[in-house]
Amino acid sequence: MVLNYIWIAFFVIAFIFALIGLMMGDTTIFQKIVDSTFDSSKNAFEISLGLTGVLALWLGIMKIGEKAGVVNVLARALSPVFTRLFPDIPKNHPVMGSIFMNIASNMLGLDNAATPTGLKAMQQMQELNTKKDTATNPMIMFLVLNTSGLTIIPTTILAFRASYGAAQPTDVFIPILMATLVATLAGIIITSLWQRINILQPVLLATLLGMCAFVGIIIWGFGQMDKDTMNTVTTLASNMILLGIILCFILAGFWKKVNVYDAFIEGAKEGFTTAVKIIPYLVAILVGIGVFRASGAMDNMVIQGISWSVEQCGLNADFVGALPTAIMKPLSGSGARGMMLEAMKNYGPDSFVGRLSCIFQGSTDTTFYILAVYFGSVSIRNTRHAVACGLLADLAGVIAAIAIAYIFFG
């Protein structure tokens, strides 16, 4: 329901700003908006088309893991934690393994593996859903974990900083890790409070503290490396783990006497079906965002409004130059990336704004895109509190990113 109102607002606000632009002499504003609808529709289809091969690959691998029993082993191992965080999911259900695979892939920055395993988890949770058009509590918790974007290896951002000539491309690594950890913890806490989950249970509390300790160790470890070593280690570790997972599933299938090839084909067929199913949802959300951006509402209403408010309060407004990246990130990953690159180009990669833009880019994920793809894959229309919890987690990540940037670079 919330997503419905947001989508309508994109078009209404865009039309109002287009009328204002026309009265100020911009006779091409309506053409820009209409062109954006065609471009966004084409982009949505191309994204879905690009996902088809990746979905087929990873859902095929996951099907091998299911038939070999690997997913069930993961589910049993994670049951003590996940049965408390997802209390509506039966103990030792295979979806626990899929959720773990998705979270692990996100943490390693393996987007190509994260989306297919996430969609598989959604399909498994939908099988438990008694109201097929309404999001369940476990679905919402799972999506908030995705939108908060906990990533421990922001390889792409570091590569962009290096290409723009940053003196120390890796100097944003620790701030990104800290900001994304805050966003993830905030997402878990907010959603748990909404769903009345007791996060003070010893097992959950120990897990959250363990997660903080793990991130702390990662921060310390990478802090001992120079930038070249760090880039080499992150790339090598990511790809070794990815290939190791594939090999593990295949060998497990062979050991259990599963027809590995047939199992892969069976799962890959599901990937094609899923890719087709999400096209309407992607078109809807990307066209809405495209119209909103093309009308100028993003710059004139949001960015300038925040800048004016901050200045009126007498606060330091240095961070405002990086806000386009933060505001665009929940709406569009490619749009936010473009804003980050533009900030580094205009202000410099080693400027406060340039660094903060990179932290924004790495601290959260594309909330509306994730909601559209994941809910669309199982035809969920009533998203309940998913949007609110996801955006609150994003807000926590943005506030943390600003505070951390002032501590490190202010």
Give a label for each model feature.
Residues 1-53, 159-292, 311-313, 385-410:
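Signature of multi-pass transmembrane helix bundles
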Residues 2, 90, 97-99, 134-139, ...:
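Generic hydrophobic alpha-helical membrane-segment signal
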Residues 5, 32, 44, 60, ...:
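Hydrophobic alpha-helical context, especially transmembrane and signal-peptide helices
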Residues 30-127, 256-346:
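Membrane-embedded alpha-helical segments and adjacent helix-loop junctions characteristic
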Residues 35-38, 45, 94-96, 131-139, ...:
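Hydrophobic alpha-helical segments, principally membrane-spanning helices and signal/leader peptides
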Residues 100, 104, 139, 230-233, ...:
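Generic signal for short, ordered secondary-structure residues
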Residues 113-114, 121-161, 166-196, 323-410:
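C-terminal transmembrane helix pair
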